[in-house]
Amino acid sequence: MNRRIFGLENEYGVTCTFRGQRRLTPDEVARYLFRRVVSWGRSSNVFLRNGARLYLDVGSHPEYATGECDSVTDLIAHDKAGERILEGLLVDAQKRLHDEGIFGDVYLFKNNTDSAGNSYGCHENYLVSRHGDFAKLADVLIPFLVTRQLICGAGKVLQTPRGAVYSVSQRAEHIWEGVSSATTRSRPIINTRDEPHADAERFRRLHVIVGDSNMSETTMLLKVASTDLVLRMIEAGIVMRDLTLDNPIRAIREISHDMTGRREVRLANGREASALDIQGEYLSKARDFVDRRELGTPAVERALSLWERTLKAIESGDLSGIEREIDWVIKYRLIERYRAQNNLGLASPRVAQLDLAYHDIHRPRGLYYLLERKGAVTRVVDDLRVFEAKSVPPQTTRARLRGEFIKRAQERRRDFTVDWVHLKLNDQAQRTVLCKDPFKSHDERVEKLIASM
């Protein structure tokens, strides 16, 4: 599939503290956060003018799901627009609390674990053809996804019985199965629940829930573009070396605890291979595939270059070449500088605070955004593109139809209902348009429905 639909869903951690103590429960904070949403959407589960979905997920986690994107750069702009929309809700909630005499700071974290050991996710969606062998797809993908944390993990200081360690992935500790239809109870690598949100005879939606939420735009680019390339190779029938892991769940943890990428994990055929070996194999196949088929767009070439530089940097032990581009490395270097300046151990509560502050999406306060202001991290999209994505849907997919419909209905004060595939006017005629093709950005039926308002 040379043109693919992508989507990202990010759940955010939420808290409110006053002088270091928790002031409100997450439920209470979430209610304040979503009060403005409920006032205009009459619900805490809404679709927005930019085609995205914003809702309160299980456990009081605000979740933002981007509209359908058919380019990785569009996807990054829309994921970052979600951060900005939630930051707006945070500022509004903070003001409401102060107006009501409740003093404290509201925080939204784009991370994957809280201090109580709970995990919440970043889910990636990739549209695939219904006609492929889904089980085979999963088999080839799992070794890639288990080792992918080495190139796009968000990093975390993990407290273990043997002391604190720096782990490359936040999510790795919370994955319990390879392939499953559950997302919360068992937390698989790939979720198989068959909800294509498209024509079920033609498409299937691959739902990957193993990845970390990324602050870094370049890490996000590498995460999605590399996965897309592996999918394209599988779809094209490229023969891959059998890298099936003997125990993917043990392997994901072992790899997460090893920043060098050299720790060997057992393969099903009895051999052993390191995360560097496995990622190197996928990279070499992808490079060859892109060159032979002349698929080298600027985004693909940028991702391949970063993939190669990241593996080389990890192999050499000199991370300076990727300290602006890969989340876990950016954060690790930040923590190491802070520890050296203040003579702190890795288990210090001040280090844990720094670890968390990296993911704070409130730009005047969050450490990632402090680095961005200093020009210490590399960007993929600029602020203007992110600002536009807050209100303008992707223009080349079904998200455009949804966004235009919502915009007109709100302007005309019409009652409506939408989901990923349906657009419905709640009038006497109950007119509904079913949009089964996520690639289709223009549809006469939708134009007519919009014109009739």
Curated annotation (Swiss-Prot):
Mg(2+) binds at E9, Y55, E63. Its EC number is 6.3.1.19. GO terms for biological process: modification-dependent protein catabolic process; proteasomal protein catabolic process; protein pupylation. Pathway: Protein degradation; proteasomal Pup-dependent pathway; Protein modification; protein pupylation. ATP binds at R53, T66, W420. The active site is at D57. Keywords: ATP-binding, Ligase, Magnesium, Metal-binding, Nucleotide-binding, Ubl conjugation pathway. It catalyses: ATP + [prokaryotic ubiquitin-like protein]-L-glutamate + [protein]-L-lysine = ADP + phosphate + N(6)-([prokaryotic ubiquitin-like protein]-gamma-L-glutamyl)-[protein]-L-lysine. InterPro entries: Pup_ligase, Pup_ligase/deamidase. GO terms for molecular function: ATP binding; ligase activity, forming carbon-nitrogen bonds; magnesium ion binding; ubiquitin-like protein transferase activity. It is an enzyme of class 6 (ligase). Catalyzes the covalent attachment of the prokaryotic ubiquitin-like protein modifier Pup to the proteasomal substrate proteins, thereby targeting them for proteasomal degradation. This tagging system is termed pupylation. The ligation reaction involves the side-chain carboxylate of the C-terminal glutamate of Pup and the side-chain amino group of a substrate lysine. Belongs to the Pup ligase/Pup deamidase family. Pup-conjugating enzyme subfamily. The reaction mechanism probably proceeds via the activation of Pup by phosphorylation of its C-terminal glutamate, which is then subject to nucleophilic attack by the substrate lysine, resulting in an isopeptide bond and the release of phosphate as a good leaving group. This is Pup--protein ligase. It comes from Kribbella flavida (strain DSM 17836 / JCM 10339 / NBRC 14399). The gene is pafA.
